[in-house]
Amino acid sequence: SYFLILFSFIPASIIIGPAISLFNILLIDISFIFFILFKKDFKFLSNKTVKLIILLCLYLVFNSVIAKDFSMGAYRNLGFIRFGIFFLAFNYFFYNNYFVNRVLVIWALTLSFLSLDTYLESISGTNILGYGEAYGARIVSFFKDEPIVGGYINGFYLIIIGFLFYLNNKILNKYKYIILIFTIFFITAIILTGERSNSIKAILGFFLFYFLNDHFKFKEKILSVLLLVLVFIFLLNTSNFLKLRYGGQFFKPIISIFQSNNEISIEREANKNLYIALYQSGFEVFKKYKIFGVGNKNYRLETCSNEKNPKYYCNTHPHQLYFEFLAEHGIVGTVILIFILFSLILSKIKIILSSKNYLQLGCLTFLLTSFIPLLPSGAFFADYNLTIFWINLSIMYAVGNKTNVFRFN
């Protein structure tokens, strides 16, 4: 019951704030360490997956040592160890289907309530607690001072949809269309936030998940895609804010670049884009620190310094995963990170597809869309993003007979 409460509280703790989320994860980690010491079961340490995670932790410690400023990245890099323990705790307790079902039902209720609040804010301008006016049409929901609710829903909705398919295969043919509508309910909430990158990831995730879903015939899959496209078009035609976010600020500049035959016009159009400037800045930092990078969380220190390169753009990170890796970890660190992360994710694809475990498939889909090139993203090693990433990775391993690091041993 103790661990059931802590795991059930994870999504709500993220909404309440980073301090509460961190406290909850540390409570899970510390409690699990004592629990595993009491059980004296350390066979999991010989598992290849666990060894890869230990290697990732060791690399991040090394990254702190060679960073421009040790103190800037040390807290983040050393703190990463908690996600390794978090991963093990998920694998141990999600061994039990009863535990999984109880936890994910509460997660589903939490996400549904947050999504309904997003709909309310899109209509009234404020959420149920009155948050939202400070950001105008941008939706914040219960996050109060950060417009990140779209990314949050995107991080959890495939877990919930996968869980509904995973819950009872015998009744799926009867209820699969209800689950499909539930999926579109979540994606619509993401689109309403105006978070373009997360909307693209959510839509691509929808396509991939349902394309690989054997409960739908090919014709049903095509109709599902058309339904989502119609919903998207309807939303754009009924909201000036969404027209601006997706049309004026996203599709129009891309179309202008492709339609122009003049290199000067293309360069001028590209220079108007904030993200192009951020990507260029990230690449400039990489050019200066090619081998090992400037160090995790040191990007801001480099780009905001007094003696800065005119191509630098002062910010906390380059807002794109691959440029972030190159700038802060260099070519060596980027190769190490991509090798470990891709090994953790891609090595299990065949097992997941053959087992037809849709909870695993939902998590896998989210993880794959996290690595789409060029799309803007939050800082990968920031607590909020890393928490959602490792929740998906942990569940993907934990609920499979051939992937759970304890069950496998």
Model-based region annotation:
Residues 120, 192-193, 213-266, 280-288, ...:
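A membrane-periplasm/extracellular boundary helix in multi-pass inner-membrane enzymes
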Residues 1-72, 98-101, 105, 163-177, ...:
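Transmembrane signal-anchor hairpin modules in multi-pass inner-membrane enzymes, especially those
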Residues 128, 264-329:
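Long extracytoplasmic/lumenal interhelical loops at the membrane interface
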Residues 27-33, 158-159, 203-207, 340, ...:
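Transmembrane alpha-helices of multi-pass inner-membrane enzymes
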Residues 328-350, 390-393:
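Selective detector of the "anchor" transmembrane alpha-helix that sits immediately C-terminal
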Residues 10-11, 29, 61-62, 85, ...:
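Alpha-helical transmembrane segments of multi-pass inner-membrane proteins
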Residues 71-75, 143-146, 193-201, 315-320, ...:
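Membrane-interface catalytic loops of GT-C/OST-like multi-pass glycosylation enzymes that act
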Residues 49-56, 70-93, 102-111, 151-156:
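Aromatic-anchored transmembrane helix interface
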